[in-house]
Amino acid sequence: MDTFLFTSESVNEGHPDKLCDQISDAILDACLEQDPESKVACETCTKTNMVMIFGEITTKANIDYEKIVRDTCRGIGFVSADVGLDADNCKVLVNIEQQSPDIAQGVHGHLTKKPEEIGAGDQGHMFGYATDETPELMPLTHVLATKLGARLTEVRKDGTCPWLRPDGKTQVTVEYKNEGGAMVPLRVHTVLISTQHDETVTNDEIAADLKEHVIKPVVPSQYLDENTIFHLNPSGRFVIGGPHGDAGLTGRKIIIDTYGGWGAHGGGAFSGKDPTKVDRSGAYIVRQAAKSVVAAGLARRCLVQVSYAIGVPEPLSVFVDTYGTGTGKIQDAEILKLIKENFDFRPGMISINLDLKRGGNMRFQKTAAYGHFGREDPDFTWETVKVLKWEKA
């Protein structure tokens, strides 16, 4: 039997790039909560003892940017210089301007356009992907890497592994077979975890705790065997982490945010962007489309692409590929027609249909760590499977 190996990685909420994503989305949440029409493009960068937010925000909301930055850092666990950043004593720099009036006029007519008339906030192309290899209809490599990272955070915050610090990375390699274009996971080949830790713990204790409290609860036992390889803090020491260890920047973990290297990616990041930015809203609607196709049993894998021009509401193109896994109910050309009939790709209508103007409740901040897709949370409206209506031959 021909098999192949495929790998996906994830990073923890305390990774400096992910810290930046969460700050950018915390600011988006605050703006949308007070003013659902807020136009937000908020970037964050960080290094030792410093966080800077910069970008373009037009909103009626009254926002204390510095407080949001400090609260977000503190919530993640950055409470002292020892762990990589001190939320209460670091420098916070704010350089926020208003959205360009040229863009405002072209996209939403300075808020005068009806929802169906709102144009895309920029050009670009986005991809949505789904696969039947997991209940989440997501790639197993990505699901496991992401859940391992989330579990690391859980056992750090609940005191199970008090030696853990916020920064960390995970990576999972799975052996697959290709079954007529569908991906069938056979076993987990390698599990890699590199986690920040305090000075007190030994490498043996780290390995034992990670196996018992992180890997065992996350990786289903049927995928593990005597040949599974475990690399647990293989560099030997990871005390210095967070922004002290590496600089961080919003939008540098776009594959972790999506499908772990499966499917395709148009290159646009999500965090800190309001729903007129099709990098985000377009990617969300095509995930819902691809997921709905697989959930309907029309294909075992599905990739959907959409593309836009700035200021133009209708998409320039919609593409679908089922990798030859169509179940024979209808062909790809008909699936494409079905997608166009069942999903409205105009940005203003995506915002309404997926309720993307609603902030608060950490709505978007939650998306900024451990993946935007495959999550069971009512706030992730794009994960709702839409029942597709079509004429059965």
UniProtKB/Swiss-Prot annotation:
Binding site for ATP: H15, D167, G168, K169, S235, G236, R237, F238, D246, R252, K253, A269, K273, K277
Top-rank EC class of the record's enzyme: transferase
An annotated GO cellular component: cytoplasm
EC code(s) of this entry: 2.5.1.6
PANTHER family assigned: S-ADENOSYLMETHIONINE SYNTHETASE (PTHR11964)
Family: Belongs to the AdoMet synthase family.
Name of protein: S-adenosylmethionine synthase 1
Taxonomic source organism: Picea sitchensis
Gene: METK1
